[in-house]
């Protein structure tokens, strides 16, 4: 419920400890609430209830003999393997080794993209005129084999139009880069294909991971087909005609790069996602689930920021792919100055940017879009605009993170810092590559930087969508029920997580209900034990880390008397386990006269139901 519905006094004693960073375990008379249960948390049979004049509680010492007016409780937000509950997989959780394999494969994809860029820069891509998936792995080893390969190259349009002066030794240099590119591609295919087949056939991969692996192996095969389709465009008979310039189609080059980027994204996203899920699982086992769910909830509320980051990832992708058009058209070889394109001009003339010579229709209706993808001058200008926009957007994210540094999780702030640094370095590399007229080392670094930038953006985006990882962890695991009571010994008390609360000194005006004026609330424990408390008819809490992860199951008779849940409450309930049709957040229920005698069941997974007299 909103603060506006709470009394001023309630706001005072609740929000003050929140500002001081305390963990508010419960609120006694003014409202009731129950922390969210995680499937499999153990249920302790010991219940500690004792008299208190204070609404804020300290550590519990189990005492079954004392309870009176006020009831407090705290779910264990940990799914740690304790004697009372053991985490068990219901679906095979991908191991970290799988994540490292996928990320290692993505590094190989990055390497082949760089090698492909060098192949394009050295004009080596058409040096091998045949497609031999098996025998092509072995390069020519003797002079006779080299001469045979060179004779095949002599029949290509590129040799006849551009390299008729080339010798066998010069041919060996360009042959190496194309051969290395193809062999590396085959190696990547085997690196992804063989482990994928093994894991799927032996059922070592979960259904979720199996689908990903099938998609990734399909992309590998598709990439090989696209690569040869691209090379064939540079061997076309039409390129023998006068005025032609033998080179691969820049459309197919962009498609080839796009397929590689899609494979790279799939590998990085899946590998990083597995590591993220393991990090969440570790948090749940260590008892930090409340912090984890609080983080997920707070991140989900940053809808505008998440949309901005998603748009930023799209912008990085478009900028990257526009670079393929720049490379395919050799557009980086013109206007090698920055920021000007020509003397004293930020852009060439309109007639140059929209040249009618690039039109293919008689009525010139394709003037604009044809120039956008075929005109080197306009293509370079587009890449500049996209790159500058990406840089400005990254700076905007950085400024936002500084302004919101108190509410953004640390890892997200770190990711934004990395994105800003990488984008700045990439922009600098791009300008240097242009000014120095596309030297191969700088251009290769610039191409590698594009994928590094994409990686940083993807990592940030994935951190801003943690709900998917958390949902998977919950669906993949369950908690074994509590062991027999005999197994609960004194040792369990030392293993239970202790919960601390802050005891403010300014709530003394809040008094116990006068006889006959209190509103009775009956809590039914998982063991069927009924506990009655009385509370005043006054405001409930605004909410905290504790109450944002809680729910109880209201008796149907009284459920109809409650106000309908608001959107925020429904969002929180979506994160909880063990929900039933009448589940509600306790912190959102105001005690009223018509609710006198209300009965609520505590979720079966609850443990550590306790109340402790505060220390003086």
Curated annotation (Swiss-Prot):
Gene Ontology CC: mitochondrial [2Fe-2S] assembly complex; mitochondrial inner membrane; mitochondrial matrix; mitochondrion
Disulfide partners: none
Keywords, comma-separated and alphabetical: 2Fe-2S, Electron transport, Heme biosynthesis, Iron, Iron-sulfur, Membrane, Metal-binding, Mitochondrion, Mitochondrion inner membrane, Oxidoreductase, Transit peptide, Transmembrane, Transmembrane helix, Transport
GO biological process, one term: heme A biosynthetic process
Ranges for region Mitochondrial ferredoxin yah1-like: 516-616
Positions in the Mitochondrial matrix compartment: 46-97, 204-212, 276-311, 402-417, 461-616
TM regions (residue ranges): 98-118, 183-203, 213-233, 255-275, 312-332, 381-401, 418-438, 440-460
Similarity section: In the N-terminal section; belongs to the COX15/CtaA family. Type 2 subfamily.
Protein name: Heme A synthase-mitochondrial ferredoxin fusion protein
Species this chain originates from: Schizosaccharomyces pombe (strain 972 / ATCC 24843)
């Amino acid at each position: 419920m909103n603060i506006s519905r709470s009394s001023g006094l309630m706001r005072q004693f609740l929000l003050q400890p929140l500002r001081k960073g305390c963990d508010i375990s419960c609120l006694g008379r003014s409202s009731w609430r129950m922390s969210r249960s995680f499937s499999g948390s153990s249920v302790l049979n010991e219940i500690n209830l004792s008299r208190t004049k204070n609404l804020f509680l300290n550590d519990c010492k189990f005492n079954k003999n004392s309870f009176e007016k006020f009831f407090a409780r705290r779910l264990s937000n940990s799914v740690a393997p304790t004697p009372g509950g053991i985490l068990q997989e219901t679906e095979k959780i991908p191991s970290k080794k799988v994540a490292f394999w996928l990320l290692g494969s993505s590094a190989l994809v990055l390497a082949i993209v760089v090698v492909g860029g060098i192949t394009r820069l050295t004009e080596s891509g058409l040096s091998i005129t045949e497609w031999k998936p098996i025998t092509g792995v072995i390069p020519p080893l003797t002079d006779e084999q080299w001469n045979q390969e060179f004779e095949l190259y002599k029949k290509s349009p590129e040799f006849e139009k551009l390299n008729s002066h080339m010798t066998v030794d010069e041919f060996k240099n360009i042959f190496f880069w194309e051969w290395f590119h193809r062999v590396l591609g085959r190696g990547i295919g085997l690196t992804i294909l063989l482990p994928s087949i093994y894991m799927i056939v032996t059922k070592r991969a979960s259904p979720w991971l199996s689908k990903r692996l099938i998609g990734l192996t399909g992309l590998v095969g598709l990439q090989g087909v696209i690569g040869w389709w691209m090379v064939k465009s540079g061997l076309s008979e039409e390129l023998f005609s006068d005025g032609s310039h033998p080179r691969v189609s820049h459309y197919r080059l962009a498609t080839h790069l796009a397929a590689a980027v899609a494979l790279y994204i799939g590998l990085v996203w899946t590998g990083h996602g597995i590591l993220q899920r393991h990090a969440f699982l570790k948090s749940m086992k260590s008892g930090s689930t409340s912090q984890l769910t609080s983080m997920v909830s707070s991140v989900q509320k940053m809808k505008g920021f998440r949309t901005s980051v998603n748009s930023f990832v799209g912008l990085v992708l478009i900028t990257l792919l526009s670079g393929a058009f720049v490379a395919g058209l050799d557009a980086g070889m013109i206007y090698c100055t920055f920021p000007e394109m020509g003397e004293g001009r930020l852009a060439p003339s309109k007639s140059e940017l929209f040249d009618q010579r690039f039109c293919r229709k008689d009525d010139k209706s394709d003037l604009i879009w044809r120039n956008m993808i075929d005109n080197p001058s306009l293509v370079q200008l587009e890449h500049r605009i996209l790159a500058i926009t990406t840089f400005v957007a990254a700076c905007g994210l950085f400024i936002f993170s500084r302004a919101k540094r108190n509410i953004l999780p640390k890892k997200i702030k770190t990711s934004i810092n990395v994105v800003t640094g990488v984008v700045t370095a990439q922009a600098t590399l791009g300008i240097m590559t242009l000014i120095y007229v596309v030297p191969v080392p700088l251009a290769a670094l610039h191409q590698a930087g594009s994928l590094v930038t994409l990686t940083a953006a993807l990592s940030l985006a994935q951190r801003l969508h943690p709900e998917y990882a958390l949902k998977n962890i919950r669906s993949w695991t369950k908690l074994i029920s509590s062991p027999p009571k005999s197994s609960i010994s004194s040792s369990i008390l030392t293993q239970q997580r202790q919960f601390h609360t802050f005891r403010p000194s300014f709530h003394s005006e809040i008094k116990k209900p006068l006889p006959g004026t209190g509103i009775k609330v009956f809590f039914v424990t998982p063991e069927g034990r009924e506990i009655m408390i009385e509370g005043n008819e006054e405001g409930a809490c605004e909410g905290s880390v504790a109450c944002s992860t809680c729910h109880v199951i209201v008796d149907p008779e009284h459920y109809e008397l409650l106000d309908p849940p608001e959107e925020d409450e429904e969002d929180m309930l979506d994160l909880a386990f063990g929900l039933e049709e009448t589940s509600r957040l306790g912190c959102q229920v105001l005690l009223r006269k018509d609710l006198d005698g209300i009965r609520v069941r505590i979720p079966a997974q609850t443990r550590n139901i306790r109340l402790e007299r505060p220390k003086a």
